[in-house]
Amino acid sequence: MCKPIADCKFADVVARWPGGTHDSFTFRMSEVKYYLERNHTTLDKGVIIGDSGYALKNYLMTPYDNPNDRKKRRYNTTLKACRSSVERSIGQLKRRFTCLKSGLRVQPDKACLIIVACVILHNIAKMLGEEDFEGDDDIEFECDPVDPAQDSTDGKVVRDHIANTFF
């Protein structure tokens, strides 16, 4: 699982489990999640975004399921636009390193090292201003929605505050 930032570079990469492992599981096991659980106390520290496959938390914003008013629909539209930048970052990485597109045919421990190396080299290329490879950036990943019971009450309060204040 990779966590891209606004300029299509990656702030974090976790390459410990097979490719079929859901990103939300990988996130739950990540140091970033544990850091946010301990240290995220206010909205001014920012939030991260996820799709409906993630549980809503006070630091992790997810879309509303069947939004029933204009503000919630606009929130969802904006969240989707932000998520598309995540998919664009992953698309750029996979075009730059085509070995990542079709699956690596090496031992799992070597695959993890290759993935991390590709992410590091991608970030270096972005910092040096290397051209991006052309291609389709609109990658949509399917996810199974998380059970709403896993959403935190604090997360709902923060999401509602964001929707009501900014949309």
Predicted regions and their residues:
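Short, well-ordered secondary-structure "scaffold" segments embedded in the functional core
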Residues: 1-167
